């Protein structure tokens, strides 16, 4: 079972920062997951919410602010804002990167950056994965690259992927940890989809999911989960 570091390693460092991603890499996660929005001037940055209220204690909107404006806000705190380009410069090629597209209309800017600077040959697409709850964003990625890996995220209904698997050419499906349905899991596996659950922070829960045959778990504490899985398999 693969360990996917949630927002890097959000349980041990500030989420969606270079520090958190490095912590996930150091913890020997198999994949690093992080969230991407685009700024008013179309720069992809790492942030989970549409505003900075939770992370920076201000209601400043991400999509209505330029990168420069957002960085000025961040400079007044101890919470840096990383651009996707900075992240790719630091981690592309070292580990598989799971880019979650959190905002409508951001996919095209993300793919443009990847094609411009990082993707040099078709096999390079295997170094990144795109995930989203928005099928429209995954559709955009697929239009721009037939080689991209697409994972559709689900909330309560674990069967939504069935309607989109062939249409979007999905490669994987992410289930909410509380709604991992055995039948849905079976269908996904029969259609050769990578299956994973989010966000799993209890070691025993991760172990039970591994027994179900799920392929991966997203966790804030990759080191803790990895240690438990290895202990049980020893």
Where are these regions (language model features)?
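Phosphate-group recognition and catalysis centered on beta-loop-alpha active-site segments
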Residues: 1-234
